């Protein structure tokens, strides 16, 4: 959970992370403007964890690693996304079916969006919110209400 140190800064929300988000958050951290980065998985393994995971799982988790962002500025909601990754690996395709599966990317994004929206009033206050398409409707609605 974030400390919300910069309550007037920028909240960046992206459930899965991507290269642009990495560059954006890195720049905001460098300028002292990142209030919080919200994502599903923030992988911060120790050396033992790196050795124990099979190569494919380790590579997937490393994509969810944000070492350039202080842990105090990251809020994560890992359970559903982690379960989606597991379901995909063990062949439970009904759970991950596009748009309709309980663990589909669409369902993960909707859940993530509602979670970020609930965090805004208490954690961030009147800062700026930067979020993405399918995971932003509720977040933007709350952000607009907060001003």
Predicted regions and their residues:
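N-terminal subdomain of nucleotide-sugar transferases
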Residues: 1-73, 117-125
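Residue-identity detector for threonine
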Residues: 3, 25, 39, 96, ...
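An aromatic- and histidine-rich active-site surface loop
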Residues: 18-22, 43-46, 51, 105-117, ...
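Phenylalanine-focused residue identity feature
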Residues: 20, 37, 66, 79-82, ...
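Short, solvent-exposed beta-strand-terminating loops
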Residues: 43-44, 71-84, 147
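Conserved nucleotide-sugar donor-binding subdomain of glycosyltransferases
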Residues: 77-128
């Amino acid at each position: 959970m974030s400390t919300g140190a910069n309550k007037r800064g920028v909240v960046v929300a992206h459930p899965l992370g991507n290269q642009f988000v990495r560059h954006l958050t890195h720049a905001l951290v460098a300028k002292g403007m990142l209030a919080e980065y919200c994502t599903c998985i923030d992988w911060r393994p120790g050396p033992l964890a790196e050795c124990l995971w099979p190569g494919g799982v380790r590579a997937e988790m490393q994509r969810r690693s944000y070492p350039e962002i202080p842990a105090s500025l990251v809020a994560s909601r890992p359970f559903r996304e982690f379960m989606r990754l597991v379901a995909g690996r063990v062949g439970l395709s009904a759970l991950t079916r596009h748009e309709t599966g309980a663990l589909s990317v669409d369902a993960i994004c909707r859940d993530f969006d509602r979670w970020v929206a609930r965090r805004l009033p208490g954690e961030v206050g009147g800062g700026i919110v930067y979020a993405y398409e399918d995971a932003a409707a509720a977040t933007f609605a709350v952000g607009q209400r907060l001003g």
